Amino acid sequence: MPGPASGRLSVAWGSIGDVRPAPTILHLDMDAFFAAAEQAAKPSLRGKPVVVGGIGARGVVSTASYEARVFGVRSAMPTAQARRLCPNAAYLSPRFTLYRQVSEVVMELLHALSPLVEPLSLDEAFVDLEAGGVPAETAAVRAVGEQLRRDIRSATGLTGSVGLAGAKMLAKIASEAAKPNGLVVIEPGTERELLGPMTVRTLPGVGPATAETLRRAGIHTVAETAEAGEAELVRLLGKAHGAGLHAMARGQDDRPVVAERDAKSISVEDTFEVDLTDRTRVRSEVLRLADRCVQRLRAAGRSGRTVVIKVRNYDFSTLTRSETLRGPTDDPAVIREAAVRLLETVDTTGGVRLLGVGVSGLADFTQEDLFAQLATEREAEEAATAAAAEEAAGGTEQHEAEEERPRRWHPGLDVVHDEYGAGWVQGSGVGRVTVRFETPWSAPGRVRTFAVEDPALRPGEPLPLVGGAPAGGQSSEPAILPKFLSPEPGDTGSVGEEISRR
């Protein structure tokens, strides 16, 4: 991401509105969360490329470690393509039990800072520091951000990047600039100078297709986007998208940090690198988004009654469809099924550039009999098709179910052997399963191969990333991550200092 310009911008933006006078909105984004958790749990993978996601022929990458990203692997990429780019990476099925455990620790640290915490996913959240009584001064909020990073490292063994600004959009941009394992402060009053020279892709919701439309109109930077004016952007992109983009380019973002339990709806959406034209891929993405939405529902202790999908087509037209269930639910199968039914009512043949799945009508309980809402007439053949699509999406429920069927030894699965102790599945096939025996606090472990039905081998539970070593071991130390993800002694975020001074 480009840094701020050294001189003042020549374009006339007008005033930056809706930004607080102090950088009291914090955005935390854990670094390569799923992959980093796997590296912390598995000493033999530290410093090596790791890819977490669906591992089948139609699987999709959920998270790639920074070592894998060097080879071009990224989230939402088909796993088959990732294997071609980085054949020597460790490809692991997600372990959502572990990720939720770590997320709960991180969210507890955030709630200690403020009553207003807005989780966006298991590994990302906004925090209103002002509501937590932190003084509205740059030095004070910086100190809070740095202490948070240290606390996260101590409690989980992982790292997170922190952005601080006077508005949510700016705080998120700051945390992106801080990656990996850093802190960036955007001082109120410096927004125009900071944002102006950045590419339009910096702004939320601007994917390759939108950027190309703007490029053809001679608009390349945030400053040029603001200068173009709302009317021109509406002409190019449509009313909603054009007006919203113009406001963001001017730094206008008055959205409050909303505690998830106070939210009226919970939703997630993704803009794609290229328009999706394959119907199967569109369905897989909807399933993946439904899983993410369920994660947020459960993190907030909520359930919802109305399922909504959002589809933005190649021509920027945006459609929404909704279905109201008989009662509130947080069951992933119910929400996926409803989202797919809604998708079937939308024509996507021209190409899809954005998809979203949301749930509204929130409640504090789950109606247990909502499994009855699943379509019962689609039995064996339909179930097989859904299972294949869910594998492509790296779905939460599927992988949890796989963990409950121990004789299907998926890569990354926790196991325990009567003689060798705790370990994880490195691979399986032709009636054999290979296990590496190591723990988060051990040295890289040895490898053994067993028959898949070996009675001495059984599924295990995720081990704590910190504090779990035997007496006399390293129980007080976090797992040691690759050096580039570890802060140097005395490091207080020099990148943040540089940006906040400008």
Where in the sequence are the language-model features?
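Gly/Gly-Pro- and Ser/Thr-rich, intrinsically disordered tail segments characteristic of DNA damage-repair
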Residues: 1-243, 375-379, 385-402, 410-411, ...
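Intrinsically disordered, low-complexity mixed-charge segments
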Residues: 362-392, 459-472
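Short Gly/Ser/Thr- and Asp/Glu-enriched loop/turn motifs at secondary-structure junctions
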Residues: 120-124, 165-168, 302-306, 352-354, ...
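Short, surface-exposed beta-strand-loop junctions and turns on beta-sheet-rich folds
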Residues: 67, 315-317, 325-326, 431-433, ...
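DNA-contacting surface of Y-family translesion DNA polymerases
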Residues: 18, 202, 210-354, 361-365, ...
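Intrinsically disordered, low-complexity linker and terminal regions at domain boundaries
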Residues: 436-502
